[in-house]
């Protein structure tokens, strides 16, 4: 009976340390940064739902990015923040079908929204990268990976090839570096 008791006590302790170890790997900036990621819902001319996906704010005044495919054929679009607030997309500022990216303005309902800061320099090949998914939950599971390749697009923008396993619903979620 004493051996069985040791096994019973060791298992919960082992699970506790495994959970603590996995939580420690999530960068500190995740809690703040996840509030900048939102869900996008687009509607057709009959006000029927067309597509859903993700996007994120890149400025506190409502400038945002998402994938262009979501907006094709849409009459209007709404973003839903991680807190559940709905805000309409008010203006399309630019789109690129080849790279499947769209830049737009959201009619924010607050003074400012949480935004991600675009990195000034490209990460090195082999650098750690985190995919920050949209989540309404308190805890968030980032997907980690490495930068496999960095190339230039249009002379000034960087295009990254990443080594990470993503789910379909992670399209248009931001990729973060070690600094967040």
Predicted ranges, named:
Residues 33-42, 107-114, 139-179:
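Active-site region of chymotrypsin-like
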Residues 55-57, 89-92, 147, 175:
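Conserved hydrophobic positions within beta-strands
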Residues 8-19:
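Sec-dependent N-terminal signal peptides
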Residues 2-8:
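Positively charged n-region of N-terminal signal peptides that target proteins for export
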Residues 23-57, 63-67, 76, 101:
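N-terminal activation segment of mature serine protease catalytic domains
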Residues 59-141, 156-159, 169-170:
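Conserved active-site neighborhood of the chymotrypsin/trypsin-like protease fold
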Residues 2, 23-24, 89, 176-180:
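Short, intrinsically disordered, charge-balanced linker/junction segments flanking boundaries
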């Amino acid at each position: 009976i004493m051996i069985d008791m040791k096994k019973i006590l060791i298992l919960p302790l082992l699970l506790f340390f495994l959970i603590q170890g996995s939580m420690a790997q999530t960068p500190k900036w995740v809690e703040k940064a996840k509030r900048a990621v939102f869900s996008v819902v687009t509607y057709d001319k009959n006000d029927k739902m067309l597509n859903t996906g993700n996007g994120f704010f890149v400025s506190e005044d409502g400038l945002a990015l998402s994938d262009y495919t979501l907006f094709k054929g849409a009459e209007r679009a709404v973003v839903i923040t991680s807190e559940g607030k709905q805000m309409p997309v008010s203006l399309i500022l630019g789109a690129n079908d080849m790279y499947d990216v769209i830049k737009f303005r959201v009619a924010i309902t607050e003074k400012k929204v949480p935004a991600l800061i675009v990195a000034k320099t490209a990460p090195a090949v082999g650098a750690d990268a985190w995919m920050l998914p949209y989540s309404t939950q308190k805890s968030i599971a980032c997907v980690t990976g490495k930068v496999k390749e960095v190339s230039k697009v249009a002379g000034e923008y960087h295009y990254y090839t990443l080594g990470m396993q993503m789910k379909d619903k992670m399209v248009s979620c931001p990729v973060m570096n070690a600094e967040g």
